[in-house]
Amino acid sequence: MVLPLMICYRPIGIIHSPFKEPKDVPIQASAAKDIEGTVEVFPEFSEGLKDIEEFSHIILIYHFHRAKFKGLLVEPYMHEEKHGVFATRAPARPNPIGISVVRLVERKGNILRIRDVDILDGTPLLDIKPYVPEFDVRENVRIGWLEKNVHKLEKARDDGRFFSLNFNYIFPASLLEAPERAKL
């Protein structure tokens, strides 16, 4: 079987948050209690939001558009030893895809108001899925090297180690310069 060299995804929207730079972004949504943001779904995808407001939480799948891949061994947040990138949640990955479970506060048309946001402003949104505990929660899990470090999560913030200062957005900058469009 021959695999394609490239797989292309088209953003379905933009995530807006108070975090304009990677530094100081909470490193997980569970450490971003009550931080508000919005999801602006592009109009051509807004029909797909039908009934989303019936869910209290949603899963956002997005592209780490400013992450800079540095290799398969990384020194993750909350630990000073290198680990394989696939044993971490570091944003700099071969395929820089992020996921966050956030609270859905309100939907107005193609705009979703959310809380517990740990995402950089202007992040391209790839997909949205409803969070369903019966599907998504697992029991008797092992968390590897994080077992000794998970207590650091609440205060852990991005220090910029995985991000590049030079980047190109994959859609028009004018969309990113109009955050007032995303306000409810």
Curated annotation (Swiss-Prot):
Protein name: Probable S-adenosyl-L-methionine-binding protein PYRAB06630
Family label: Belongs to the tRNA methyltransferase O family.
Keyword annotations of the record: S-adenosyl-L-methionine
The TsaA-like domain, residue ranges: 9-140
Entry keyword S-adenosyl-L-methionine: yes
Listed InterPro entries: TrmO-like_N, UPF0066_cons_site, YaeB-like, YaeB-like_sf, YaeB_N_sf
Pfam families: TrmO_N (PF01980)
Disulfide bonds: none
Residues at which S-adenosyl-L-methionine binds: P26, I27, Q28, H65, R66, R89, L120, D121, G122, T123
Keyword Zinc-finger recorded: no
SUPFAM superfamilies (UniProt xref): YaeB-like
Coiled coil: none
Gene3D superfamilies for this protein: YaeB-like
